[in-house]
């Protein structure tokens, strides 16, 4: 089982190192500002994964107001409600069902467990992101959104544009594009996507379950039509 905090910090800090390697002029010479970025607690637990160039200008040019503070508190409370009330309740339900003996399962119980777990992971993860965005706003920072109603997606491609957006953008910028993106033909493009989802699975957990999970999502991404295909068929 991975450490969520450690994995978030690892790829976030690595993005800074890679960006500085690509462009040495963006190095932060002020140690306090760099440590503020590295240790800024709202984003430590579960994102959003903030790249340094997204927050650098805000460090010395933050603006605070009663309106922003109120919005931040409201957003934090919304995230806390998601986590404590919805995620914990559905998580308890899912754990109780998954703890049953196989002989105690039936079609309905299995589906209730699957749906409960599906709701738990969304409200848990998005709740933490809401709390992070809210706390950041209280301190005068603006974080990008991390979830955009992923369960209303029209397909797996649309889903990954809505789910943990900052993670998808990170892998796009630091893995997919450096591998060649879509510039070297369709086969290479799909191969690069498969590598991205393999690494995404490993990021979620260093065991074969998540490796297989990543490969399945990579295969689904390859075989699924895009939202534009849905629109064209209407």
Segments predicted by a language model, with ranges:
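Membrane-embedded transmembrane alpha-helical bundles that form the catalytic cores
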Residues: 6-224, 228, 234
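Cationic, low-complexity basic patches in intrinsically disordered or flexible, solvent-exposed regions
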Residues: 2
């Amino acid at each position: 089982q991975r450490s969520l905090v450690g994995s978030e910090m690892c790829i976030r800090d690595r993005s800074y190192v890679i960006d500085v390697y690509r462009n040495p002029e963006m190095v932060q010479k002020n140690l306090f500002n760099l440590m503020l970025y590295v240790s800024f607690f709202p984003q430590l637990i579960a994102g959003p994964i903030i790249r340094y160039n997204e927050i650098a200008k805000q460090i010395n040019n933050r603006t605070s107001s009663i309106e922003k503070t109120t919005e931040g508190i409201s957003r934090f409370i919304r995230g806390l409600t998601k986590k404590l009330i919805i995620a914990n309740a559905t998580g308890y339900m899912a754990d109780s069902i998954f703890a049953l003996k196989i002989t105690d399962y039936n079609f309905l119980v299995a589906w209730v467990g699957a749906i409960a777990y599906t709701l738990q992971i969304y409200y848990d993860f998005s709740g933490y992101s809401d709390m992070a965005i809210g706390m950041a706003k209280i301190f005068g920072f603006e974080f990008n959104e991390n979830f955009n109603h992923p369960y209303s997606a029209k397909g797996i491609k649309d889903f990954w544009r809505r789910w943990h957006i900052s993670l998808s953008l990170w892998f796009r910028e630091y893995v997919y594009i450096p591998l060649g993106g879509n510039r070297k033909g369709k086969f290479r493009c799909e191969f690069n996507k498969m590598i991205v989802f393999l690494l995404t699975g490993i990021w979620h957990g260093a065991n074969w379950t998540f490796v297989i999970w990543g490969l399945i999502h990579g295969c689904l991404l390859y075989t699924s039509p895009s939202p534009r295909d849905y629109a064209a068929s209407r």
